[in-house]
Every structure is written in structure tokens, then in C-alpha cells.
């Protein structure tokens, strides 16, 4: 059970996990903007897989903070 209630916007109800997904997406974009210029992606075998794993890890950390 999350700390946040279901939020209703213009008659559409959004569960709390929706906002956790959006927050983790914003943090993912920031982390990715930092990692790309550093050249970390030159050492990554599969960039799409790395991005997916990074997003999943960030989402897990964000969801653990709010539960």
C-alpha cells in the first residue's frame, strides 16, 4: 500500500504507481544525460538493455522510498 491516495484528474483516476513511474522516468532522463557525455556507453555491450536495466533499478529505488 502506497502513502499516496488515488488522484483524480478530469475524471480520470491515476494510481500512485503512475506518478512513481513518471518520477523515475524524469530521473532516468537526467542520469542518462549525465552518462552519455562521459563515454560510459562505449563500454556497454547493449545500450538498450543497459537503459532498461537502469530504468528498472531507478523505479525500484523510487517505489521503495514511497512504500
From Swiss-Prot:
Keywords, in A-Z order: Cell membrane, Membrane, Transmembrane, Transmembrane helix
Highest taxon in the source lineage: Bacteria
Pfam families: DUF1656
Membrane topology: Multi-pass membrane protein
GO cellular component, one term: plasma membrane
UniProt record similarity statement: Belongs to the AaeX family.
Membrane recorded as keyword: yes
Organism phylogeny: Bacteria, Pseudomonadati, Pseudomonadota, Gammaproteobacteria, Enterobacterales
Position of the signal peptide: none
Inducing or repressing factors: Positively coregulated with aaeA and aaeB by AaeR.
Subcellular location: Cell membrane
This protein's record includes keyword S-adenosyl-L-methionine: no
TM region positions: 3-23, 43-63
Organism for this UniProt entry: Escherichia coli (strain 55989 / EAEC)
Protein name, per record: Protein AaeX
InterPro entries (UniProt xref): DUF1656
